[in-house]
Amino acid sequence: MSAFCLTESQAGSDAGAIAATAVRDGDTYVLNGTKQWITNAGEAEFYTVIALTDRAKGTRGVSALVVEKNDPGISFGKKEKKMGIRASVTREVVLEDCRVPKDRLIGKEGLGFIVTMKTLDNARPGAGALAVGLAQGALDEAASFAKERHQFGVPIFSFQAVQHLLADMATRIEAARALVYAVARYIDSGPKDYCKEGAMAKLFPTDMAMQVTVDAVQVMGGHGYMREYPVEKMMRDAKILQIYEGTNQIMRNIIGLALNKEYSRKK
């Protein structure tokens, strides 16, 4: 199991603002800094740490190194209490004079920001796929409930208001599924850059999953709000999909900048 250590208390959406350092010392690098909200922290065996090797160069002075769980100088914070995705562990990763061999450097010094962006570009369609699966589960739960739940002597599925909610849910899911598959096929074709497409494959499906899970709770009414039913958990889990791997506002920034470049070239 591995973990990707990028986020810091002052470096969330602004990945270039990281403060963690990796200083070359002979045949080793000495790492110092704290990474925040790291999935699998304390459980993973390997940690890809994004740190500054040359502060003066800005993002070109960022490098990526591998730290192992048992290396001296690495420790972990408390297990965070989260709104959702409670099945995964989230902790701080603390590096205090953590010394690692120079061959733990990924690629060359200064390539860390590129490693980070490529990692996120590849991870974002995965978040979209998670969103599609989560939303499909919420629809299945809501539709099954609507068939069984009776009000005014008939199943609530027979009410047009409920049918419209379910129809919108199903349509949004299929649209998001098609987008995720299309982007996956595009990435498999080997394009030089797919930053825009990766952002799209995260943005639309994750916004969709949030809406669909909220609507699933609405279809189920008071039952949906209770912890005995899974849709309230699905709604809580859906929220993080709009936040991690780059917030959906950042996704819109990425898409907008890419479109601006594309249409500038067409003039």
Feature-to-residue mapping (PLM):
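Short Gly/Pro-enriched turn/cap motifs at secondary-structure boundaries
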Residues: Q10-S13, W37-N40, D54-A56, K82-V89, ...
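A short core secondary-structure module
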Residues: G16, T28, N32-F76
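Basic, amphipathic alpha-helical recognition segments used for DNA target recognition
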Residues: V67-P72, K102-D103, Q136
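A short, Trp-centered hydrophobic/proline-enriched beta-strand micro-motif
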Residues: M1-L6
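Short, charged, solvent-exposed linker or helix-capping segments at domain edges/interfaces
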Residues: G61, S75-K78, P101-E109, K267
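Flexible, small-/acidic-enriched active-site or ligand-binding loops
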Residues: P72-R99
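Alpha-helical interface subdomain recognition
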Residues: G12-A15, R24-Y29, E92-D97, K108-L111, ...
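Short, surface-exposed charged micro-motifs
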Residues: A19-T21
